[in-house]
């Protein structure tokens, strides 16, 4: 697909395997993951530096697991507040929905507050670990074109200098107003909310109460959120007829803050910004050699804090697949599973976020009265209360098709869901999270059994060529039993008993886990070989000895 571009003579040429448009969180995560896989990456960003004002304020357990996968979670955690509850309040201050899940099945707290600019800075600094990754700021993407085996990008610097980039693949992480998506004429379906919200960030938190509160005031709904490093965020609905300029005026800002603070004059304002809440979804996530990710593919209201986290899911899902294709270990048909797996869940998160917004600010006042009464009654039903407390309403990603092999009834199958991440004990006595023992790899994890037993020599060669780790899980008391050791198999102890419970619940003794920690297949030793053949087929894996030419950019 060719796209018209100016007749320009580039002064600088770049040749890479992957070009990423946009140095936001999704682009930076993609670059970190591909960087550690040895892929040549160039990130191009229109701005002259990272955005330094707070935007997203919620990071979940899945996103922290993604940070862990690229070795950055220890640097991210100091900028988070774990176990961050969300409470919906009536106009009189009564809590009618309390969301504070205390589960950590993926290894991290489910809800966390965070400061996005500081976490983005951690990811940018993380790129310095990889000589094969570069990030260029002050580069405006003016045009691009696709050929059979590459994408050509035309850039312009602040000084007007022209540059060209030739890449095998382009990942568009250039935001909700994505130039790439618009240029490709990909429909961005959905709607824009009629109401805007003004966000006010304050240093030296004048309240210092923990958690986040959503006050469902019919006169002017507002949000009060405690953030790390003593930052307080308030969000107020902008009412019809009000403008950002008016609300920024000192007397009007004082009036807003007097609603939530006893002394609105004694505050240290960081900044105020007006946001519009959109709920939109790209019709396609892959267009030949261009892939859309993050806000370029979907945008949603902020009320469940899932815009940022959905972008992290995109990056984790796409990066390992793109690396396999570039390395010649899979055909590019594998990239079609990115949209197949991610689009439906992104739609579910959009719908959840819209619903949460309607709970906070119902379109009709009578709906708010009904909400308050019904919620008061439901809170006296323990199952309903647990449903909110444990955040069970959040649609957990589950893939029904794509890079996986499903056996049996889909409703009860763990295939297509994220695998748990408990602590395990290594043979040297160290206790660590499961992913740390696996690295950024596939894993075949067996309960009590040698995971290689049911595999042919050819299969072992094929999966080892992918970097697969073969894990035998045993009760912790058996970890030092030398007679159970097998060459090429890592033995770990089930420190918390969670792996035993998981395998018992799902009636399987072997799991094939993808690099993004999703269950690709389950089996028992006698069926593993057949299951791996099916999985290799649906993932379009190549044979290690096959004559596969890895694409190179001229």
Curated annotation (Swiss-Prot):
Pfam families: FAD_binding_3. It catalyses: 3-(3-hydroxyphenyl)propanoate + NADH + O2 + H(+) = 3-(2,3-dihydroxyphenyl)propanoate + NAD(+) + H2O; (2E)-3-(3-hydroxyphenyl)prop-2-enoate + NADH + O2 + H(+) = (2E)-3-(2,3-dihydroxyphenyl)prop-2-enoate + NAD(+) + H2O. Keywords: Aromatic hydrocarbons catabolism, FAD, Flavoprotein, NAD, Oxidoreductase. FAD binds at residues 17-46, 285-295. Pathway: Aromatic compound metabolism; 3-phenylpropanoate degradation. The keyword Transferase does not apply. Its cofactor is FAD. InterPro entries: 3-HPP/3HCI_hydroxylase (IPR023786), FAD-bd (IPR002938), FAD/NAD-bd_sf (IPR036188), PheA/TfdB_FAD_monoxygenase (IPR050631). GO terms for biological process: 3-(3-hydroxy)phenylpropionate catabolic process; 3-phenylpropionate catabolic process. Its EC number is 1.14.13.127. GO terms for molecular function: 3-(3-hydroxyphenyl)propionate hydroxylase activity; FAD binding. It comes from the Bacteria. Catalyzes the insertion of one atom of molecular oxygen into position 2 of the phenyl ring of 3-(3-hydroxyphenyl)propionate (3-HPP) and hydroxycinnamic acid (3HCI). Belongs to the PheA/TfdB FAD monooxygenase family. This is 3-(3-hydroxy-phenyl)propionate/3-hydroxycinnamic acid hydroxylase. The gene is mhpA.
């Amino acid at each position: 697909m060719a796209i018209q571009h100016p007749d320009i003579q580039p002064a600088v040429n770049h040749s890479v395997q992957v070009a990423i448009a946009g140095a936001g969180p999704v682009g930076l995560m993609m670059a970190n993951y591909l960087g550690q896989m040895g892929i040549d990456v160039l990130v191009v960003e229109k701005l002259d530096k990272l955005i330094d004002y707070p935007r997203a304020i919620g990071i979940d357990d899945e996103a922290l697991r993604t940070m862990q996968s690229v070795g950055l979670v220890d640097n991210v955690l100091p900028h988070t507040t774990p176990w961050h509850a969300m409470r919906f309040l009536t106009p009189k201050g009564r809590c009618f929905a309390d969301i504070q899940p205390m589960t950590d099945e993926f290894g991290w707290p489910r809800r966390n507050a965070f400061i996005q600019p500081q976490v983005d800075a951690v990811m940018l600094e993380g790129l310095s670990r990889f000589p094969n990754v570069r990030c260029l700021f002050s580069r405006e993407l003016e045009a691009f074109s696709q050929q059979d085996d590459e994408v050509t990008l035309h850039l312009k610097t602040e000084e007007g200098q022209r540059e060209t980039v030739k890449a095998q693949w382009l990942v568009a992480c250039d935001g909700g107003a994505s130039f790439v998506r618009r240029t490709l004429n990909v429909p961005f379906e959905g709607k824009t909310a009629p109401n805007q919200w003004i966000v006010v960030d304050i240093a030296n938190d004048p309240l210092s109460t923990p958690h986040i509160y959503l006050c469902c005031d019919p006169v002017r709904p507002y949000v009060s959120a405690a953030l790390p490093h003593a930052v307080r965020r308030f969000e107020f609905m902008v009412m019809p007829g009000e403008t950002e300029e008016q609300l920024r005026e000192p007397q009007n800002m004082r009036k807003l803050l007097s609603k939530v603070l006893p002394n609105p004059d004694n505050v240290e304002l960081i900044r105020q910004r007006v946001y519009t809440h959109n709920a939109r979804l790209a019709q396609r996530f892959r267009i030949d050699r261009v892939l859309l990710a993050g806000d370029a593919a979907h945008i949603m209201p902020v009320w469940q804090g899932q815009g940022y986290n959905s972008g992290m899911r995109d990056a984790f899902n796409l990066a390992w697949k793109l690396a396999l294709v570039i390395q010649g270990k899979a055909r590019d048909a594998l990239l079609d599973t990115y949209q197949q797996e991610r689009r439906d869940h992104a739609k579910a998160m959009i719908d959840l976020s819209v619903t949460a917004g309607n709970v906070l600010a119902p379109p009709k006042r009578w709906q708010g009265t009904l909400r308050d009464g019904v919620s008061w009654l439901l809170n006296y039903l323990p199952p309903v209360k647990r449903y909110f407390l444990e955040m069970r309403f959040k649609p957990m990603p589950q893939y029904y098709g794509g890079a996986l092999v499903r056996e049996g009834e889909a409703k009860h199958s763990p295939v297509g869901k994220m695998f748990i991440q408990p602590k395990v004990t290594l043979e040297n006595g160290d206790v660590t999270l499961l992913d740390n023992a696996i690295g950024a790899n596939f894993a075949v994890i067996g309960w009590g059994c040698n995971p290689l037993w049911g595999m042919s020599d050819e299969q072992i060669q094929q999966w080892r060529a992918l970097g697969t780790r073969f894990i035998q899980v045993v009760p912790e008391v058996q970890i030092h039993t030398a007679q159970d050791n097998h060459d090429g198999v890592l033995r770990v102890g089930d420190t918390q008993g969670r792996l035993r419970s998981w395998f018992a619940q799902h009636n399987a003794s072997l799991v094939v886990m993808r690099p993004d920690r999703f269950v690709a297949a389950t089996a028992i030793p006698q069926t593993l070989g057949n299951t791996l053949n099916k999985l290799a087929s649906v993932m379009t894996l190549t044979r290690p000895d096959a004559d596969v030419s890895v694409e190179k950019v001229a």
